[in-house]
Amino acid sequence: MNNIQDCFLKTRKNYLQFLKKEKIFKKSNRHQIQSLKNIYIPLSFWIEKQYTKRGKTLFLGLSGGQGSGKTTVSGILKIILKIFFKREVHVSSIDDFYKTHQDRQQMSKTIHPLFKTRGVPGTHETQLLKKFFIFFKRKNFKKFKLPKFDKSTDDRFKKRYWNNIKKKPEIVILEGWCIGAKPQSNALIKKPINILEKQEDENFIWRKYVNEKLKREYKNLFAKIDHFIFIKIPNFKMVFKWRLLQEKKLKKKSHSNKKIMNYKEIKRFIMFYQRITLQMIKDLSKSASVVIFMKKNHEIKKIIFRT
């Protein structure tokens, strides 16, 4: 029996249980089974190879457009790496590092009104992200807490609800829509790409501030990541469709629906992400160590390894 087949037999049950838990299991799940064999298991073997070569904690950045399946992919990788390779894996989302609602309100008053809305570089607590890397890279590991963000209330959880990290992981996956994003030229920043930018950021103060953050703070943070895995969406239109599905899912999970977005709100919300998402499709499709190509029906088309 080869290693791929052995891994498949040992992880199949947990994989299908995870899909059911996430409510993405399909009764006619032939494609999902094929994805385990042809996508997730080979990717897990690649990660194991990178970890073995490195010999110390491996940091992976997983990015892709909103609703592309980053949380699903990272969850599946964690299952395979833990069950088959016996690796200690930690997954964090950059979303958990958003600034508090109050801090973003303050930014909207002192810098630009568009900073009321979370998401773009500049709305994350970069000091907490720095600590994230420092704590995980320590030779003498000490337990610590990582923040948690509640999207249904648009605010950070109180510290007593934060994630307790008690054991040093061998593999760390940081997932998020803008992980690995690069800044644009000033000439591009000046040209609005949607109605939001044209009407609400006429003097390009908001997008210039975001771009400056990418040039400095975020560039330094992303430099700490060993390899990038990029989920390439077919086009930006799919972001709206998939984000709508995410909000419906969030509504079912949440006890408080006051911050969950409707159709019109989502349409406006994704405009905040459009510029960087489109730039990332150009950049990371070429530079990421691994590229996962998605189809319009949310199934994986293929995977490419560059290292």
Question: Locations of the language-model features?
Answer:
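Pre-Walker A (Motif I) flank of P-loop NTPase domains
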Residues: 54-62
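Post-Walker A alpha-helix
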Residues: 73-74, 78
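Conserved NTP phosphate-binding and transfer environment spanning the P-loop NTPase/kinase superfamily
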Residues: 1-23, 27-40, 177-307
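Conserved nucleotide-sensing/catalytic segment adjacent to the nucleotide-binding pocket
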Residues: 24-35, 90-93, 97-154
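Pre-Walker A adenine-sensing motif
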Residues: 41-54
